[in-house]
Amino acid sequence: MSICVPAIKDLATVPNDIWQILQHDLDNWDHQNVQYSYDQAFIRHKAKLYFTGDPLNPSIPDDISNVIDWCKTVIGNEYTAIRCFLNLIESGHEFPIHVDTLKLHCLSRRLHIPLSNAEECFYYTYDKIDEQYIPHEHKMKLGTLYELDNINPHSVINRGKNSRVNFIVDMIPTNQITANLLMPDIEQRNLFNKLRK
């Protein structure tokens, strides 16, 4: 029997000035203009990427830099943001059980701030017991900073009438930043493939 207990941790309440920055950006996001979208029968989500690509030299918009600086006050100034985006999951859609597979996911701390009132959106983490995944249901509240353990199996289901939008940032210890962070991690890729079977 093997057991892992991935978690969603409530880290802090988002201060009003940071909340206003994120809400302003969300209000001005044209959902038709996205850098990434994934659309299948049961999975529909869109993302607005603030920066990605070269983890050694990211270009960060000033207002988002303020949000990241606040996140550092919560988790520690030894961290650097290497990916940052808004992520939307439409009403009635889901992310099935999966793990994130890049090297950066194995080294980083993934932070979430829920920005939309999607009351029927649920997050699931899983214990693995005797080769079966046992789900644990979680809710994320508006105005709260969370950390999600995304290298262990997790999923999201939006059963509500509203789209779910979260601000997501990957923070990595500055001394561990290397050029190959955006390459797949072999162990994580193998686990991802097993979950898909």
Range-by-range predicted roles:
Residues 1-78:
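Non-heme Fe(II)/2-oxoglutarate
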Residues 2, 83, 164:
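A residue-level signal for beta-strand positions that form part of recognition/binding surfaces
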Residues 6, 108-110, 166:
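Intrinsic-disorder/low-complexity, polar/charged segments enriched in Ser/Thr/Lys/Arg/Asp/Glu/Gln
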Residues 9-13, 115, 169-171:
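Short beta-strand-to-loop capping motifs
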Residues 40, 44-46, 52, 89, ...:
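Structured loops at beta-to-helix junctions and adjacent beta-edge loops in soluble globular domains
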Residues 70-146:
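Catalytic core of non-heme Fe(II) oxygenases with the double-stranded beta-helix
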Residues 122-197:
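Catalytic core of Fe(II)/2-oxoglutarate
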